[in-house]
UniProtKB/Swiss-Prot annotation:
A GO biological process held by the record: tRNA 3'-terminal CCA addition
UniProt binding sites for CTP: 8, 11, 91, 137, 140
PANTHER family, A to Z: MULTIFUNCTIONAL CCA PROTEIN
One Pfam family hit: HD
Protein name as it appears in the record: Multifunctional CCA protein
EC number, UniProt record: 2.7.7.72, 3.1.3.-, 3.1.4.-
Molecular function terms from GO: ATP binding; CCA tRNA nucleotidyltransferase activity; cyclic-nucleotide phosphodiesterase activity; magnesium ion binding; phosphatase activity; tRNA binding
Domain HD, residue spans: 228-329
Additional remark text: A single active site specifically recognizes both ATP and CTP and is responsible for their addition.
Length: 407
């Protein structure tokens, strides 16, 4: 029995970046031997076992054969006779097909180290096209490794385009699409996930609402980049710099979906996009099964971002109404998340990345002033029933007015 560290752990170790998960492949063993050694089986379709102490995954070396459509249409063959090279051959990218033994000796039959050096994401074999999920995985690796200068090999991009053309992406479940998208939101460059999917044609299939933004013009006065799709990528980039929260990053990526359905006769103006976008966000989140926490923030940002951009023009009464609608009295962190998205939107414009965003400070000032109004003092002043809320509203508005006058 031979045990090797494989996949992402070896790749990240060689790149000098933190290793979080370790996966192992076992050559020359049977399932019975693994059970006898105290390992617990976890794989229903594949021979995967958990180590009795570390709980890390150990998989028997295997080969795969395409038998049907989609990422599940595979027949798995495993036996003690399957060689390490055969197991590595079925993997997606050369940089993920390097193994390391207990002495630190590397086994790299497909040139993964060379591609790591050259910063290339390249498929291991032509069997790459058999699994449509790999299109999304490569896009995610492009996002994860973008700061190190990685790019997708031309020939791999061609294979990704052929997978899209084959219609195989339709076999991906909503859960798988969301899983990869969510993982991409946690990478250093989430915009690259969208950009690579756009490049190979997959964005139109898995996230058509975002794809529809490309080629849609905006007023050059406010958006030097003009194209709404390019703006979305820039906003995604800025959101990742401003916040590590996947929820904030998601909301930033989808806040402008309404611009994709503006009638061309109205271009480059998008007066209704804050409202038309709400339906599209709901539709996308339902289809891809996006968690409610992500959907809810995205809807709020979509509806309010134009108002927040105009913070200097908003009346105190309007500000309090916005705070009520967002329910920030009970969820203070929500306002901060929304302001981060708006700041990313503001900075996500060509040449304006470092432009100040005083609107956030003004909104926060107004919020803190409104927050200082205590309901207890209103009750002590003799107000009862519905009159308490009316008086609270009035005092909050006055507090905001005074704070902004003194700003």
């Amino acid at each position: 029995m031979e045990v090797y560290l494989v996949g992402g752990a070896v790749r990240d170790k060689l790149l000098g970046i933190p290793v979080y998960d370790q996966d192992w492949v076992v050559v020359g063993a049977t399932a019975e031997q693994m059970l006898n050694a105290g390992y617990s089986p976890v794989g229903k379709d594949f021979p995967v076992f958990l180590h009795p102490k570390t709980k890390q995954e150990y998989a028997l070396a295997r080969t795969e054969r395409k038998t049907g459509q989609g990422y599940k249409g595979f027949e798995c063959f495993f036996s003690p006779d399957v060689a390490l090279e055969e197991d590595l051959l079925r993997r997606d990218l050369t940089i993920n097909a390097i193994a390391m033994d207990s002495q630190g000796v590397l086994y790299d039959p497909y040139g993964g180290q060379q591609d790591l050096q050259n910063r290339i994401l390249r498929h291991v074999s032509e069997a790459f096209v058999e699994d449509p999920l790999r299109v999304l995985r490569v896009a995610r690796f492009a996002a994860k490794l973008a700061p190190l200068g990685f790019r997708v090999a031309d020939e791999t991009m061609q294979l990704m385009q052929s997978i899209v053309a084959s219609g195989e992406l339709s076999a991906l479940t909503a859960e798988r699409v969301w899983q990869e998208w969510h993982k991409s939101l946690l990478t250093p460059a989430p915009q690259q996930f969208l950009a690579v999917l756009r490049q190979c044609g997959a964005l139109a299939v898995v996230l058509p609402e975002i794809d529809a933004l490309f080629g849609v013009p905006q007023p050059e006065k406010w958006h030097p980049e003009i194209d709404t799709g390019i703006h979305t990528l820039l906003v995604a980039e800025q959101a990742a710099k401003l916040s590590s929260s996947a929820v904030v990053r998601f909301a930033a990526q989808v806040h402008d979906l309404g611009k994709g359905v503006t009638p061309p006769s109205e271009w480059p103006s998008h007066k209704m996009h804050c409202h038309t976008g709400l339906k599209l966000i709901k539709q996308l989140c339902e289809r891809v099964r996006v968690p409610n926490e992500f959907r809810d923030l995205a809807l709020m940002v979509c509806e309010q971002h134009s108002n927040i951009h105009r913070a200097a023009e908003l009346k105190p009464q309007t500000m309090v109404k916005i705070f009520n609608k967002l329910d920030v009295w009970r969820k203070a962190e929500r306002l901060n998340d929304i302001l981060l998205c708006c700041q990313a939107d503001h900075a996500g414009r060509q040449g304006l990345q470092d432009h100040p965003y005083p609107q956030a400070e003004r909104i926060q000032l107004a919020y803190q002033a409104a927050l200082s109004v205590e309901v207890q003092s209103i009750i002590q002043d003799g107000f009862k029933g519905p009159a308490i809320r009316d008086e609270q509203e009035r005092r909050r508005t006055e507090a905001v007015k005074a704070a902004l006058l003194n700003a």
